[in-house]
Amino acid sequence: MASPAIRLTQYSHGAGCGCKISPKVLDKILHTEQQKFFDPRLLVGNETRDDAAVYDIGNGVGIISTTDFFMPIVDDPFDFGRIAATNAISDVYAMGGKPIMAIAILGWPIDKLAPEIAQQVIEGGRYVCQQAGISLAGGHSIDAPEPIFGLAVTGIVSTEQVKKNSAAKPGCKLFLTKPLGIGILTTAEKKSKLRPEHRGLATETMCQLNKPGADFAHIPGVTAMTDVTGFGLLGHLSEICQGSGVQAILHYSAIPRLPAVEDYIAEGCVPGGTGRNFDSYGHLIGNMSDLQRQLLCDPQTSGGLLLAVLPDAEADVQAIAAQHGMTLSPIGELTSADSRRALIEIVV
């Protein structure tokens, strides 16, 4: 008799980027009274919660360094590896860079899950690294109470083309390269409420590499770029606005979303990270309905790129998007700071 299929999500208390520590708590953890070491060649550190660190090694070249790991968001081990690797590599693309190598991070409950299952996870990560044109060059593993997998990724970028999350300008249009709703659909699957026609949609979305980011880097009018992950669209947009000294207007109806997300929200398929995100960022946001809040605060795992684009660069952005098989439409715009308004306002 065949043994039942392993459900990895049963072995962890969190899922994907929804495992992230809330921004409020993270601020307390990272607080320090120590004087910060100053290195003029460190172009991007953690001051603005950017996607990766960037270090100037001379001759116009910057090294990008980032790491990302989490607990299973899907049951299939190979897919878990694919998703975790795609998510980790995304931070390099979000800085406008090109990945050059990765090393693996693995935590595994060896008394609960067979090593052959961990091997499938690693194979999923290796597969995505090959898609990105890089080697999975090594790694580190520990015996852990819950399965954890991710990568530490190294990339390169022109120091003139680094895309920070803190350089956006008033007048920029906002573009999002992947639909929202990943946390909602994966929660629906975990609750056995996902309809047959929607199976696999979230997984394939999470496994799409954000390669266009390396091409968007060549456009000066792309003033800021980040990837939308565990803090949701509102969280990551808030960081752009706060870091850049601007405010935003979001057009809710223009925001791409996965099929039937509103229906699943109505059925209670809302991940726990949604509430944590709102607790951290809700005071910065204007009026919105419960439905809007639950979608816009939905924690994304391996979500899309969020771009701030000056009007004269929109055609170039659309051209690159088309080369990658995407059609983009603006989801909002950035405005000058005005203390009479919320940091982000939601309109229909």
Swiss-Prot record:
GO terms for cellular component: cytoplasm. Keywords: ATP-binding, Kinase, Magnesium, Metal-binding, Nucleotide-binding, Selenium, Transferase. One of its GO terms (biological process) is selenocysteine biosynthetic process. It catalyses: hydrogenselenide + ATP + H2O = selenophosphate + AMP + phosphate + 2 H(+). The record marks 20 as: Important for catalytic activity. It comes from the Bacteria. ATP binds at residues 20, 48-50, 68, 91, 139-141. It is an enzyme of class 2 (transferase). Its EC number is 2.7.9.3. InterPro entries: PurM-like_C_dom, PurM-like_C_sf, PurM-like_N, PurM-like_N_sf, SelD_I, SPS/SelD. The keyword Cell membrane does not apply. Mg(2+) binds at residues 51, 91, 227. Homodimer. HAMAP family: SelD. Belongs to the selenophosphate synthase 1 family. Class I subfamily. Synthesizes selenophosphate from selenide and ATP. NCBIfam families: PRK00943.1, selD. This is Selenide, water dikinase. The lineage of its organism: Bacteria, Pseudomonadati, Pseudomonadota, Gammaproteobacteria, Enterobacterales. The gene is selD.
